[in-house]
Amino acid sequence: METKKPKAIARKVSIAPRKARLVVDLIRGKNIAQAQAILTFTPKVAAPVILKLLNSAVSNAVNNLKLNREQLYVKEVFVNEGLRLKRMFPRAKGSGDMIKKRTSHITLVITSSTNLQTSKEEEQSGSKN
């Protein structure tokens, strides 16, 4: 049986997924203190949103699952494309172009380093099929 993993999801964030992925790639695999420091000093629009999401996931882990804050790290974080809002941009001679305002769904999963060690031990002790 798989243990619960604390996670947080931000949906319909009005940031293009391509721009959000630049920030997300910086914190993948880092411990929580490092990730918060990186996000605090990253001059990208997506950084404050992802920092807020990281703090939410840490709070979920500490309050709901009683995990130790110092042992947490970012296990997986990814950005999926959300809705595209289509807007008209007027051009010359009465024509117009379509502007796609892209949104993102950002998912962040954290885990404890002790959970990682026990899952590796279970994999090694298990038999191969």
Swiss-Prot record:
Subunit structure: Part of the 50S ribosomal subunit.
Keywords: Ribonucleoprotein, Ribosomal protein, RNA-binding, rRNA-binding
Functional summary from the UniProt entry: This protein binds specifically to 23S rRNA; its binding is stimulated by other ribosomal proteins, e.g. L4, L17, and L20. It is important during the early stages of 50S assembly. It makes multiple contacts with different domains of the 23S rRNA in the assembled 50S subunit and ribosome. The globular domain of the protein is located near the polypeptide exit tunnel on the outside of the subunit, while an extended beta-hairpin is found that lines the wall of the exit tunnel in the center of the 70S ribosome.
Family in the record: Belongs to the universal ribosomal protein uL22 family.
PROSITE patterns recorded: RIBOSOMAL_L22
InterPro entries recorded: Ribosomal_uL22, Ribosomal_uL22_bac/chlpt-type, Ribosomal_uL22_bac/org-type, Ribosomal_uL22_CS, Ribosomal_uL22_sf
A biological process from GO: translation
Keyword Oxidoreductase: no
Any GO MF annotation of the entry: rRNA binding
GO cellular component: cytosolic large ribosomal subunit
Official protein name in the record: Large ribosomal subunit protein uL22
Superkingdom, taxonomy of origin: Bacteria
